[in-house]
Amino acid sequence: VIKVNRRGNPEDTGAEAKPSAFAWARHASAGFGGNSLPEGARRRALADWIVHPDNPLTRRVIVNRLWHHHFGKGIVTTPSDFGLGGDLPSHPELLDWLAEELLRNGWRLKPIHRLIVTSAAYRQSSQRVDAKAASLDSGNRLLWRQNQRRLDAESVRDAVLATSGKLDITAGGPGFKDFDYTEAYAPVYRYVSPDKPELWRRSIYRFIVRTTPHRFMSVLDCPDPANLTPARIKTTTALQALALSNNEFMLRQATHLATRVDNESGSRAEAIRRAFALAFQRSPTDAEHRAAETLVAEQGLFSLCRALLNANEFSYLD
């Protein structure tokens, strides 16, 4: 039997603690049957309470995180705090409507993703110029334009591998370890970067060492895995430019990309167009093509591919 400690003092116990939900949430019974029920039944009661059709909070939190993922900022900018200490929603009616859509679609996330990415708000350009809107809403809280967003660390890694043609898109199965493990007085993890297919899987399958963050990923603002991170911090530093330009992984993938475009092209001009198509999903402008021709003639395809993988256009979504 667990009892409530008065003022946190274990020597001064009060009433018996019983499984229950928050009393302020009145969409369903706050009691879960007391301690007489088996643990499995109490867990089921909690799960049913969380996803009860009359409980909008769970759905609001979920759709807000989906919105945050696509726009870089949620309708509520404090994704882990919907209480009195959190931010107010910028579009409360939209938040509630999306929450109801989630329920209507049987809690499936894919329809909500589709709904968001096909919306007029999402399909706006971040380059839109509107002096009046900028003066009234410089932070773009009301979404009069799209937010320019930089790819997160995992997406940068996956995009580089996809562009070079080395990304392993196999779904499921065991993850990969990009570190060596040594048993000592305390475990020692040393990150390695051999150029082999086992390490070319998507980043979602990468084993995370909570006590030893990956340096390259950390430089690109991958959060410390030992801490809870409701929203990632975005920074722009010289270290990021140096890492993207000189990291061993980036140099190897630039080499693979150069080999790929060379094999898939019959001429230098065609190789340049193919490199731009793979990296930027477009053809080069006349000025870009002339500059690329000069660079390739002097330093080879590797230098062009290295430059493309380091360009803002590769790492940012407009």
Labelled PLM ranges:
Residues 300-314:
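Charge-dense polyanion-binding interfaces
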Residues 207:
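Conserved beta-structured recognition patch
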Residues 202, 212-221:
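Active-site Gly/Thr loop motif
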Residues 1-198, 223-232, 245, 250-302, ...:
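Primarily short, surface-exposed interaction patches in extracytoplasmic proteins
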Residues 218-221, 285, 310:
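Exposed, low-complexity/repetitive linear segments and helix-based recognition motifs
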Residues 235:
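Glycine-rich phosphate-binding loop at the start of an alpha helix
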